[in-house]
Structure formats: structure tokens, C-alpha cells
């Protein structure tokens, strides 16, 4: 029986750990690839910035390009006052992009295809933005729940709707990212399996098509990290700027 395209998303235990308060904390393939993503990002930045030079080398150029891209994204969505949160936004972008890209490699696993992982990342953003909002605006941050010009009789309903929308942010962020990663990797698996079954793997046209598809998936992996980053900056804008 042929393997399902969804088998690539199965959580597999690598080694067991004692339960904590009844919760299973076994080290899984998802844990492994999140650790690999973290190490990869740290090494990439360390190697790129270890020997800074006026004329940057290849890795330094990439690190500086990503940094400048993050700065530009923050400035365009939050403003100069948002630049103090570059470490947060940079880390989120790099971690998600690396997790997405590692899943494309042979024998790789896409940690961001699981809602538990993407929801955890989204909650980091949600909690951080909420804390930053109260830090910058104090109690006035709650104005985000009541749009200006709202009639008094409509205020209770609007507060309820806006509160629901605000609390739904991490849910929408996590579902969007996980769903896109599942869809992209599943399509590649299905088409690759079809090519192998038809015994046309070595013919030029299917090979070219698969290469193009993988290239597109790399683009989508980076694009999803970018979209998540932009939405994070939009939420930061709500927290930093008074309404």
C-alpha cells in the first residue's frame, strides 16, 4: 500500500521523556526540526557577522539584506518608534522561514505544518504585542476595542466584536501559516508520487515541472514567513500608536 501524502506530517517520537503534570513532552521529529531551525538561525547570523567587513562576504551580505528588509518592514508598518522591536520581528521571521525551508529538504519535516507549533508562535506575538501596547499606552491601549466615532448605544456591541477579533488574532495567524505549508508540501508529494508511478521520472518534462514546483514552494515558504512578519508589524503598530 502506497504511503499517503499526509504521512510526511506525522509526529514521530524520537525518545521518550517523563511526563510533566500529566503532559507528554517526548522529544519528537517536530522538536528536532525546531531545534535544528534555532541552531541554523544562530549559526547563520554568527558566521555572517563574526568578521564584519566594509565589503561584506556572501553570508554577511545575506544577513545584512534580511536585517535591512526587517527594518524597512517595521518602518513602513509601525514607524521609527517600532525599531526597538527589531530583535522580536527578526527572530520570528528567521525562525518561521527556516522551519518552512527545512521541510522542503529530503527527509525533512515541516514543524510549521502543525497548528500546535504555529499557535505557540502566534501566542508569543499576541502576548508580546499586548504587553507592548500597555507599556506604550497604559490603560488607553483598550481604546483599540472601541473605534472612534462609535455611537454610545452601539459601544457595548462594538467592544464585544473588537475583543473577539483581537483574541482571534493568534488563531487566524496560526491557521493561515499551517494550512499553507500543508497544502504546498502535499501538492509536491502528490505530483512527485504520480511521476514515479508513471515511470517517467527521468524524462525532461516532469523533472522540469517538479523543479519549478519546488522552486515555487521555496518562494511560498519565504512568502509565508514574510506575511506572518508583516501582520506582526501591523499588530505592533496598534500597540505602539495611540488610537
UniProtKB/Swiss-Prot annotation:
Q: Which residues form a coiled coil?
A: none
The cross-references to SUPFAM superfamilies, in alphabetical order and at most eight, read:
F1F0 ATP synthase subunit A
**Entry keywords, A to Z:** ATP synthesis, Cell inner membrane, Cell membrane, CF(0), Hydrogen ion transport, Ion transport, Membrane, Transmembrane, Transmembrane helix, Transport
Checking Pfam families in the record gives: ATP-synt_A
**What are the recorded GO MF terms, alphabetically?**
proton-transporting ATP synthase activity, rotational mechanism
Transmembrane spans: 29-49, 54-74, 89-109, 114-134, 144-164, 182-202, 208-228
Source organism's superkingdom?
Answer: Bacteria
User: Where in the cell?
Assistant: Cell inner membrane
Could you tell me the membrane topology recorded for this protein?
Multi-pass membrane protein
A GO-annotated cellular component? plasma membrane
Q: Which NCBIfam families match?
A: ATP_synt_6_or_A, PRK05815.2-4
Q: What does this protein do?
A: Key component of the proton channel; it plays a direct role in the translocation of protons across the membrane.
Similarity field: Belongs to the ATPase A chain family.
Subunit text: F-type ATPases have 2 components, CF(1) - the catalytic core - and CF(0) - the membrane proton channel. CF(1) has five subunits: alpha(3), beta(3), gamma(1), delta(1), epsilon(1). CF(0) has three main subunits: a(1), b(2) and c(9-12). The alpha and beta chains form an alternating ring which encloses part of the gamma chain. CF(1) is attached to CF(0) by a central stalk formed by the gamma and epsilon chains, while a peripheral stalk is formed by the delta and b chains.
By what name is this protein known?
ATP synthase subunit a
Organism from which the protein derives: Ehrlichia canis (strain Jake)
Please spell out the taxonomic lineage of the organism that makes this protein.
Answer: Bacteria, Pseudomonadati, Pseudomonadota, Alphaproteobacteria, Rickettsiales
